[in-house]
Each structure stands twice: as structure tokens, then as C-alpha cells.
């Protein structure tokens, strides 16, 4: 296997967990909120896309790979999902996630796992799996995609940063060269091949801001 950079990624997200979650809470100054709305608009757009694509989740078993601070997890629980498992490599993110679902009164429907999905043995199958804001930081996606395919029975939603957008060099410099977190970008053919090779069939492929957002099904 190729050398993996996940420990480096985990340290980065652990360090910025609280600040990143403020994108969702809006607990920032007015200028910072305005900058988020402009430069990070697709963070909000991808959230809306996931909720639209998953539709009625009542009674569903869901896995959120790279769940971060639990924003998708708690919303699925509030919408009636039977159980949601969030998997993430950053302990501080998982603390935020556990606090969030507790505050929202849905903790009984949720559990969180500190792990890289590459080394995690899923205890069950899931009707729906999502990996949003995840592939940006993955050096070698194929094996993780195959693992996700192994525990997904119905729908897999994923978001991939697009190659050749104006934000690509900005993120590359800011994240990789200044903050020390590797970041990757993908073309549409690359994403389609990765998903197909892992055992998925693409149901829909959309451009959402600077992202490829893909709804796929296991085959």
C-alpha cells in the first residue's frame, strides 16, 4: 500500500475543529461570516444537496464517513433515521459531534467511532453512506471506496473537490504549503472511474459550487 497521510490530516482537523464548526454555527464576526458565505458557499450547498438526495430517511441505517462535528449526523437523527454512525479521525471533532447530538436530544440514535475507515470494521450494513468533505484529504481513495462499498446496501453520496477551479491553487497553497494539510482535486472522469472500480454505479453527477457531488448505488 502507498504511504498514507491520514495521521497528518487527523492532526490538522483536531487542531481546527472548533474554528471549523463555526462555519455552521455562525459564531463569528460579521466580516468572517460574510467571507464564509462567499468563499465557502458550497459547504452549505453540499449540505442541502445531501438532504435533498437522501429524502425520507425514517427507519434508515446511515454511516457518515468523515463526520466531523456531526452536522449531518444530527440532522439525519432529527429526520427519523433509525441509527447513524459517524466515523472520523479527529478526537476533537467527535467531541463536538457528541455534544451536538446530546444538545439536540438525538444521542440515542447516534454513535461515533474514532477511526480511519481504512482500518475500521463496520459492525453492520448501512442503507445509506455519505463521505462529504472527506476526499479532499485522501491520497489514495480506491481502498477506502471499496471498504465503503462493502457496508453500503442502498445509496452512497460523495463530494469531491473539482480540478481546475479558481479556488484550487488557493486551497493548495493555504492548506498544503502553509498549514501542512495535504489536499487533492479530481476531474469528473477520475471520480467516475474511482466509483466504478470500487463497485458503484453513478446515478447522478452534479456540479455544486467547486465540487463534484455524486449519488451512486452499489452493484
Residue ranges and their predicted role:
Residues 68:
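Conserved glycine-rich SAM-binding loop
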Residues 128-140:
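A short SAM/SAH-binding and catalytic strip from SAM-dependent methyltransferases
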Residues 163-181:
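Short, glycine-/aromatic-enriched active-site segment of Class I SAM-dependent methyltransferases
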Residues 138-148:
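A short, conserved alpha-helix within the catalytic core of class I
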Residues 153-161:
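Conserved beta-strand signature within the Rossmann-like core of class I S-adenosyl-L-methionine
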Residues 182-198:
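Short alpha-helix
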Residues 1-54:
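Conserved class I S-adenosyl-L-methionine
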Residues 63, 71-114:
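Class I SAM-dependent methyltransferase SAM/SAH-binding core
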Amino acid at each position: 500500500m502507498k504511504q498514507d497521510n491520514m495521521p497528518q490530516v487527523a492532526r490538522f482537523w483536531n487542531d481546527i475543529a472548533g474554528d471549523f464548526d463555526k462555519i455552521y454555527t455562525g459564531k463569528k464576526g460579521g466580516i468572517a461570516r460574510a467571507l464564509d458565505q462567499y468563499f465557502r458557499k458550497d459547504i452549505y450547498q453540499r449540505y442541502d444537496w445531501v438532504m435533498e438526495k437522501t429524502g425520507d430517511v425514517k427507519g434508515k441505517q446511515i454511516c457518515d464517513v468523515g463526520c466531523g462535528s456531526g452536522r449531518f449526523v444530527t440532522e439525519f437523527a432529527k429526520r427519523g433515521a433509525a441509527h447513524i454512525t459517524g466515523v472520523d479521525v479527529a478526537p476533537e471533532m467527535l467531541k463536538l459531534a457528541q455534544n451536538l447530538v446530546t444538545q439536540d436530544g438525538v444521542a440515542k440514535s447516534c454513535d461515533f467511532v474514532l477511526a480511519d475507515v481504512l482500518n475500521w470494521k463496520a459492525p453492520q450494513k448501512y442503507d445509506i453512506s455519505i463521505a462529504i468533505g472527506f476526499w479532499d484529504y485522501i491520497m489514495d481513495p480506491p481502498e477506502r471506496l471499496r471498504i465503503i462499498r462493502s457496508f453500503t446496501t442502498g445509496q452512497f453520496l460523495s463530494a469531491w473537490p473539482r480540478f481546475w477551479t479558481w479556488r484550487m491553487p488557493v486551497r493548495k497553497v493555504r492548506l498544503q504549503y502553509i498549514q501542512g494539510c495535504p489536499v487533492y482535486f479530481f476531474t469528473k472522469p477520475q471520480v467516475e472511474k474511482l466509483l466504478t472500480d470500487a463497485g458503484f454505479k453513478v446515478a447522478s453527477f452534479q456540479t455544486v459550487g467547486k465540487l463534484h457531488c455524486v449519488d451512486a448505488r452499489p452493484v
